């Protein structure tokens, strides 16, 4: 994939995360600045999501550590765990929030 396609795929994925947070009613603040999306929780903990253009990966940093996601067969998959990106974001949000979050 070229860089334009990479950025479009990441933009779409981040938009889905924003919509899921908004629709869930969870108390999670988010902000995107440049290539970085920051999710912040009541306890001031954060999840950082960063696009890595040179490697064409999405990186996620949270209390659980750092994870790299590569685009394979139409999904962003964690190179360490094999978990799909949106599922991992939801899991990590629940850990940070300390509660179950209802998002599709």
UniProtKB/Swiss-Prot annotation:
Keyword Iron belongs to the record: yes
Alphabetical list of SMART domains matching this protein: Frataxin_Cyay (SM01219)
UniProt xrefs under PROSITE patterns: FRATAXIN_1, FRATAXIN_2
Record GO biological process: iron-sulfur cluster assembly
GO molecular function annotations of the record: ferric iron binding; ferrous iron binding
Domain of life the protein comes from: Bacteria
Any Pfam family matching the protein: Frataxin_Cyay
Keywords: Iron, Metal-binding
GO CC entries: cytosol
Xref: Gene3D superfamilies: Frataxin/CyaY (3.30.920.10)
Membership in a protein family: Belongs to the frataxin family.
Function summary: Involved in iron-sulfur (Fe-S) cluster assembly. May act as a regulator of Fe-S biogenesis.
Protein known as: Iron-sulfur cluster assembly protein CyaY
Gene, per the UniProt record: cyaY
């Amino acid at each position: 994939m070229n860089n334009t396609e990479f950025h479009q795929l990441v933009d779409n994925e981040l938009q889905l995360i924003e919509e899921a947070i908004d629709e869930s009613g969870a108390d999670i603040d988010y902000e995107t600045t440049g290539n970085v999306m920051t999710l912040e929780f009541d306890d001031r903990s954060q999840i950082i999501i960063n696009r890595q253009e040179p490697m064409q990966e999405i990186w996620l940093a949270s209390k659980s550590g750092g994870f790299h996601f590569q685009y394979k067969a139409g999904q962003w998959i964690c190179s360490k765990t094999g978990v799909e990106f949106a599922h991992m974001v939801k899991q990590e949000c629940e850990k940070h929030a300390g509660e179950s979050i209802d998002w599709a």
